[in-house]
UniProtKB/Swiss-Prot annotation:
This is ATP-dependent Clp protease proteolytic subunit. One of its GO terms (cellular component) is endopeptidase Clp complex. The gene is clpP. It comes from Anaeromyxobacter dehalogenans (strain 2CP-C). It catalyses: Hydrolysis of proteins to small peptides in the presence of ATP and magnesium. alpha-casein is the usual test substrate. In the absence of ATP, only oligopeptides shorter than five residues are hydrolyzed (such as succinyl-Leu-Tyr-|-NHMec, and Leu-Tyr-Leu-|-Tyr-Trp, in which cleavage of the -Tyr-|-Leu- and -Tyr-|-Trp bonds also occurs). Its main location: cytoplasm.
Amino acid sequence: MPYIPMPYVVEQTHRGERSYDIYSRLLKDRIIFLGTPVDDDVANVIIAQLLFLESEDPDKDINLYINSPGGSVTSGLAIYDTMQYVKPQVSTICLGQAASMGAFLLAGGAAGKRFAVPNARIMIHQLSGGFQGQATDIEIQAKEALRLKAKLNEIMARHTRQPIERIERDTERDYFMSAGEAKEYGLIDDVFLHKKAADKKPQ
C-alpha cells in the first residue's frame, strides 16, 4: 500500500503559528473520522476521542463520520457502547460506505441525527468467522457467535424499529442499500447533499 503523507493544517494564534495533523484539527471541531476497518487499535483511538470530547463539553454534539468496511465485532461494540455512554449526543454521517460493523455504528447514532450522503452505500450482514481447535472449543465458540449474533440483531432492531424477524432474515446474507433505502429501512434519518442540511437539524 503506498505511503500517503499526513496532511497538516497551520493556524495563526496569538502565540504565533501552530500546526495540527488534519485529524487533530477536526477533533477541535468535535469531528471524529472512522475511515478504516474496525479493530482494537482503531476502537481505542475513537473511544479516547469520544471520552475527551465529553470532558471538553458534555452538552455539545459529537460528529462521527464513517467510511468503513466494518471489522471486529467486539471492537465495534466497544465503540458503540461508548457512543451510548457519553453524555453528548453522537451524530453519525456515512460517506462512501458503512458496511457490517460500520453500518451498525451508523445506526447507533443519536435518533434524528444519523445521516448519509446520496451516493453512500450501506451493507448489513451477520457476523462471520472461522472456528478452530478441539471439538469442545469449537462448540464454545459457536455458542458465543450465536449469542453475539442475537445481541447485534436485537440492537439493530431497536435502532431501526424493524421487527427482529426482518433483521434476522435480511442479515442472513449481505444486504446492500442505497442512502435512500437505508433511510426507509431506519438505519439513518436523512440523506443530505450539503453539510448545512445536517447543521439545520435540531441540537
